[in-house]
Design a protein with these regions (language model features):
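Short, small-residue-biased leader/transition segments that mark boundaries at the very start
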Residues: 2-4
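A generic structural signal for well-ordered coil/turn residues at beta-strand boundaries
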Residues: 6, 48, 109-112
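Conserved beta-strand segments of alpha/beta enzyme cores
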Residues: 6-8, 79
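Generic beta-strand/beta-sheet core signal
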Residues: 10-13, 54-55, 83, 106-107, ...
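Active-site adenylate/phosphate-handling loop in enzymes that bind or generate adenylated species
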Residues: 16, 21-94, 98-99, 144, ...
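Short active-site-adjacent structural elements
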Residues: 61-63, 89-93, 105, 114, ...
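A short alpha-helix-loop-beta-strand transition element characteristic
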Residues: 100-108
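The feature marks non-catalytic terminal segments
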Residues: 107-160
Length: 160
């Protein structure tokens, strides 16, 4: 049984700002994604889900190299399913058109991937270096994560 009952809209901005201020800029994306996965896993656990599903595809962007996905997975205790993993961009666009998400995906707006993007993001992250960089957040991250989780907006989705 799939556990897709609702959507969680997380205000991640304060976490992003802390990462931006305290961590090496070439590691911004991978560190942000690791904290996003931790938050996603929190809600999946809360909803008694058995895994996370993402829309990543190998090589589409810097954060979707094999090494980057491994670094992202490293923070998760539950399985991460990636049904699009080997599809090319055109296949993914076709699917997004079929499930009526394409038009939303191309809207021009600033999000975490455009505002906090590194000029030269790491594509082969070293997990030990990433963990060392994350230690720079130790004084603030627990409170920031708690606030992000506590202020999350939950949007109920009709099962049909």
């Amino acid at each position: 049984e799939m556990c897709i009952r609702d959507r969680h809209v997380v205000n991640f901005t304060d976490i992003q700002l802390a990462i931006y201020e305290k961590c090496p800029h070439d590691e911004l994306t991978i560190i942000m994604r690791r904290y996003m996965m931790k938050i996603a896993e929190h809600f999946a656990d809360e909803d008694k889900c058995l895994g996370l599903i993402t829309g990543e595809s190998i090589g589409q962007v810097a954060s979707q190299t094999m090494q980057s996905l491994a670094a992202t997975n490293e923070v998760c205790h539950m399985p991460v399913y990636r049904p699009l993993i080997a599809m090319d961009k055109n296949d993914i666009i076709d699917i997004s058109n079929k499930i009526d998400t394409y038009e939303t995906s191309i809207l021009p707006y600033e999000d975490c991937c455009t505002i906090f993007v590194a000029k030269h993001p790491v594509t082969k992250p070293n997990i030990n270096r990433i963990k060392k960089s994350e230690e720079r957040l130790n004084d603030v991250i627990d409170e920031l994560m708690k606030t992000a989780i506590d202020t999350t907006e939950v949007i109920m989705v009709d099962a049909e």
